[in-house]
């Protein structure tokens, strides 16, 4: 269930298998709960098939860490709101990666869900909007 919420259910089975093997090798959730979020993110990024967006989704949904996911939907929304014109995940993450630390885990998950729902409902890949309330 946690892998599905993190968005990994669509990934190749080898990436999921690698993640589970790594999780077992490092001692599981209890051991990982004792290390900082940035260190855990670095370790996740070292795994085959885990990029920045997937690492942050895992942090948010699998490891229960309050992080901001700077995905394409977030970049489009922030651009439209005038909060920055970010071309890449890493550019936006450098600016907004830690803004949610003062919020609860549930609030961080809800923010990500709302941004994704907005993007699915109103966003177009060309940077235009459908019938969006932001116009």
Task: Specify the residue positions occupied by each region the protein language model found.
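Catalytic cores of DNA base-excision repair glycosylases
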Residues: 1-135
């Amino acid at each position: 269930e946690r892998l599905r919420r993190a968005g990994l259910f669509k990934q190749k089975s080898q990436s999921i298998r690698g993640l589970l093997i790594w999780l077992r090798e490092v001692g599981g959730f209890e051991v990982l709960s004792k290390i900082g979020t940035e260190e855990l993110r670095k370790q996740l990024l070292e795994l085959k098939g885990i990029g920045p967006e997937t690492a942050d989704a895992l942090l948010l949904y699998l490891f229960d860490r309050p992080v901001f996911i700077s995905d394409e939907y977030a970049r489009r929304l922030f651009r439209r709101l005038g909060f920055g014109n970010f071309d890449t995940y890493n550019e936006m993450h450098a600016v907004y990666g830690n803004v949610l630390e003062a919020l609860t885990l549930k609030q961080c998950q809800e923010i990500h869900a709302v941004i994704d729902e907005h993007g699915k409902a109103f966003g177009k890949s060309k940077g235009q909007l459908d019938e969006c309330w932001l116009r």
